[in-house]
Amino acid sequence: MARPYAKRSLAGAAMLVLSTLSVRAQQPARPPQASCEKLTPPSTHVSPTAADPKDVASQDAIIAALYDVISGPACQARDWDRFRSLVVPGARLIPTGFTSGKAVTRVMTPDEYATASGANLERNGFFEKEISRTGETFGAVTHAFSTYESRRKANDEKPFARGINSIQLSNDGTRWWIVTVYWQGERPDSPIPAQYLKPPAN
């Protein structure tokens, strides 16, 4: 996820994906900022938005929707209502990283994440892609370990960051929900283990 936990984050050079805090696994150089017309800030305290059935029909679909909704070129507003439609009431987004050698986390609501990360995602451009996933399911409870790459432009040759999203999901019998997204960026002293870089089976 884009991470509003650092002065420079996955979401912008200051995080999903932390944009105002100091937890950043890798600190990429601040990208040139696009000259955008004023974008509408994310709304808060809105009525729940009905999900697109295609977004919540399967585990694959809801994880794909999560990555898609935060991704886009510079100056393109993100659909935060769609983002909210993916998560349960009370969902949490939890970026983690290290400052002064100590692990630090920040627990956010979906609205807090949208407010913290939205401007940087939209100003700088941000594309996050899943490259590997492992998971387990018991009854209605599913845990997915989703490895990601982050780019400023969709066609950038190399990602500026990688990491793992630990995604907790629930299936209520009619649709899938995201309960928690807890993530950490890769660091030079903490590379992603090989078992979490295996491409998905076809």
Regions found by a protein language model. Give the residues of each.
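Bacterial N-terminal signal peptides
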Residues: A11-T20
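Surface-exposed, charged secondary-structure patches
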Residues: P28-A29, R92-L93, G97-D156
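Short, low-complexity N-terminal intrinsically disordered segments enriched in polar/charged residues
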Residues: Q26-S85, L197-A201
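Bacterial N-terminal signal peptides that target proteins for export
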Residues: A2-A11
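Hydrophobic pocket/interface hotspot
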Residues: L66, F83, A91, A144, ...
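Early exported N-terminus immediately downstream of N-terminal targeting peptides
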Residues: C75-W80, R84-K102
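Short beta-strand edge/turn micro-motifs at domain boundaries
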Residues: P28-T40, R162-I192
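Sec/Tat signal peptide C-region and signal peptidase I cleavage site
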Residues: L21-A25
